[in-house]
Amino acid sequence: MSARILDGKAMADTILAVIHDKVAEREVQGKRRPGLAVILVGGDPASAVYVRNKKRACERAGVNSVSHDLPETTTQPELLALIDTLNSDAAIDGILVQLPLPVHIDAETVIERIRPDKDVDGFHPYNIGRLAVKMPTLRPSTPRGIMTLLRATNEELRGKNAVMVGASNIVGRPMSLELLLAGCTITVCHSATRDLESFVRSAEVLVVGVGRPRMIPGDWVREGAIVIDVGINRLADGKLVGDVDFDTAVERAGWITPVPGGVGPMTVATLLENTLEAALMHNP
């Protein structure tokens, strides 16, 4: 068999168009556009690309974006002071701090400084906690985007065996909560997991997000499984690949996301969905 492709780019385009129309409706009603502040500290090339993609998406969705490109030498108190200013700015509905941050800045402290109702990445402990107790508000953007992809399969998720490979705060942990909320029986695999292969083979829904190119061989994938590859890794020859060996997995899976063009565009689109939701909270 050959898997059906979950085209994240096409879905993201649809989401951005819907947001654009909703923003236009709000403007007709005399309401302001949603505002997103994007903070980049330092000159990491990959981070700069991600920020540029988010700005382009804002333009397409009709969301006002304000950029704060700070030098590598920015101190933690300086960054926190900027966040305080943005927290108090009524025109800003969402605050995004591009990760990773320079080593002298503590990311957890920075994330916790963002007002939870402006935390459109969904990283704040308050928002993670609400997700954990089945009362989500602003959901973590990558897991929320993945859930949109999963729903697009029209398969019943309730009761399925789901395996999350990776336990990061950004993807693995909140993704496991989303799958639990959807009624899956969820297993989280991490660096201390023994016999990873056996867990992967059992997965009817497999989500992988570890940042290691092709670490999951395609022949581990269960026949007919839904495979979501969060990883994006650049090889020495410049090729971008995921954490799953796509070329072999595509022959066994029922559904699979490509890399690039799968989870990445959905993360950006979901970020703007969250920004619109925040705007609706601030200016109904």
Swiss-Prot record:
EC number: 1.5.1.5, 3.5.4.9
Name of the protein described by the UniProt record: Bifunctional protein FolD
Top-level taxon in the UniProt lineage: Bacteria
HAMAP family the UniProt entry points to: THF_DHG_CYH
Classification via InterPro entries: Aminoacid_DH-like_N_sf, NAD(P)-bd_dom_sf, THF_DH/CycHdrlase, THF_DH/CycHdrlase_cat_dom, THF_DH/CycHdrlase_CS, THF_DH/CycHdrlase_NAD-bd_dom
UniProtKB keywords: Amino-acid biosynthesis, Histidine biosynthesis, Hydrolase, Methionine biosynthesis, Multifunctional enzyme, NADP, One-carbon metabolism, Oxidoreductase, Purine biosynthesis
Gene Ontology CC annotations of this record: cytosol
Keyword S-adenosyl-L-methionine applies: no
GO MF term set: methenyltetrahydrofolate cyclohydrolase activity; methylenetetrahydrofolate dehydrogenase (NADP+) activity
Role this protein plays: Catalyzes the oxidation of 5,10-methylenetetrahydrofolate to 5,10-methenyltetrahydrofolate and then the hydrolysis of 5,10-methenyltetrahydrofolate to 10-formyltetrahydrofolate.
Pathway(s) where this gene product acts: One-carbon metabolism; tetrahydrofolate interconversion
Coiled-coil regions, chain positions: none
Catalysed reaction equations from the record: (6R)-5,10-methylene-5,6,7,8-tetrahydrofolate + NADP(+) = (6R)-5,10-methenyltetrahydrofolate + NADPH; (6R)-5,10-methenyltetrahydrofolate + H2O = (6R)-10-formyltetrahydrofolate + H(+)
One Pfam family in the UniProt entry: THF_DHG_CYH
Family: Belongs to the tetrahydrofolate dehydrogenase/cyclohydrolase family.
GO annotation (BP), single: methionine biosynthetic process
Self-association and partners: Homodimer.
Binding positions (NADP(+)): G166, A167, S168, S191, I232
SUPFAM superfamilies, per the entry: Aminoacid dehydrogenase-like, N-terminal domain (SSF53223), NAD(P)-binding Rossmann-fold domains (SSF51735)
Gene that encodes it: folD
